[in-house]
Amino acid sequence: MERAIKNFLSQESAGGILLMIAVALAMIMANSPLSGMYQGFLDTEMQVRVGSLDIDKTLIHWINDGLMALFFMLIGLEVKRELLEGALSSAAQASLPTFAAVGGMVFPAGIYLLFNYGDPVTQAGWAIPAATDIAFALGVMALLGSRVPVSLKVFLLALAIIDDLGVVVIIAMFYSTDLSMLSLIVAGIAILGLVGLNRKGVTALGPYGVVGLILWIAVLKSGVHATLAGVIIAFCIPLRAKDGSSPSESLEHSLHPWSTFIILPIFAFANAGVDLSPMSFGDLLSPVPVGIALGLLLGKPLGVLVFSYIGVKLKMAVLPEGMGWKHIAPVALMCGIGFTMSMFISSLAFVGDAEAYGDFARLGILVGSFASAIIGYFWLAKVLPEVDVAKESKKGEIA
């Protein structure tokens, strides 16, 4: 189990660096003579037609609805594993990150709504600063190497997973519109099919893939966001087979490199390009970007710390061994790295006539996320013990 966690953490670390490169490239293209080509590329129409079934979307929608469904499937697999066998499998293990995650969603949303009070259009973005980007946050933490205790990494990982689960619930409840009953019925039948496969002990992934594709198409057509299909599929895939193997973990390990090195960087490149040329200084200080940036930079750490403190004081949660509040505080700041998850919610919150707010939202996400990353990194570096270079070198020679 420890080896699996280490492999996961190191892979997410490398992914964080790749995400930074993708964001930088998107910003350069969006603010250069290549901006027209960049936007035109994202607006390219792509159509899939099989008989009477017709799916016609722009490239950016294929990325957000299709590729991100695979990412959310990975989230579902991680959540299921941690709930059944991992860091969230007991009340004692799950209590502190659960308190922290809830506070880390409530406070940022409250700060955003405070800045956007009275405007029903911009209020739709209340959930944008409530998300944490697990890849980016772990990537920043990994820059400190062996100085970071495993308990601190597991705390951040568990918190981010619960946060992701909260985001899934938020999307299902608040960002699904114009529902199609026929498509929902087809989706319901597909879900029953997936549950049936699980109950019958089917461990081959092929049947889940076929029924899962039907579910994704039905959910896409239903008005509920298509990424939720990925989570449902993940929850239906068996964690353990009779021979002790794990179909769920096998798929999780297969999806990880695709998600880390392809899906998330593509998503970041497609969604992070903000054209700054038409913006004035007043636009930068408007309620949407300020509410998001402060929600991430102040709301996230405050929520994580306050709710964690309440949980500990009520004796409903305990700090992991070797961890103190001086460690929790900078990690709470790193939870303000919303980035890809926040951008994803932004793409759902500001659509149609409100789409113009999307650039403001992305700007707030970038400012809040990068500020949280920088301050969190230097704060954590200050409170962690220095590595004994001579000792580490000696260890390497012995190995």
Swiss-Prot record:
Family membership noted in the UniProt record: Belongs to the NhaA Na(+)/H(+) (TC 2.A.33) antiporter family.
Keyword 4Fe-4S: no
Originating organism: Shewanella sediminis (strain HAW-EB3)
HAMAP family given in the database record: NhaA
Cellular compartments annotated: Cell inner membrane
Gene designation per UniProt: nhaA
Assigned keywords, A-Z: Antiport, Cell inner membrane, Cell membrane, Ion transport, Membrane, Sodium, Sodium transport, Transmembrane, Transmembrane helix, Transport
Transmembrane regions: 14-34, 59-79, 95-115, 124-144, 154-174, 177-197, 213-233, 261-281, 290-310, 331-351, 363-383
Catalytic activity: Na(+)(in) + 2 H(+)(out) = Na(+)(out) + 2 H(+)(in)
GO terms of biological process kind: regulation of pH
Alphabetized NCBIfam families for the sequence: NhaA (TIGR00773), PRK09560.1 (NF007111), PRK09561.1 (NF007112)
GO CC annotations, alphabetized: plasma membrane
Name of this chain's protein: Na(+)/H(+) antiporter NhaA
Main localization category: membrane
Summary of the function given for this chain in its UniProt record: Na(+)/H(+) antiporter that extrudes sodium in exchange for external protons.
Membrane topology of the entry: Multi-pass membrane protein
One Gene Ontology molecular-function label: sodium:proton antiporter activity
InterPro entries: Na/H_antiporter_dom_sf (IPR023171), NhaA (IPR004670)
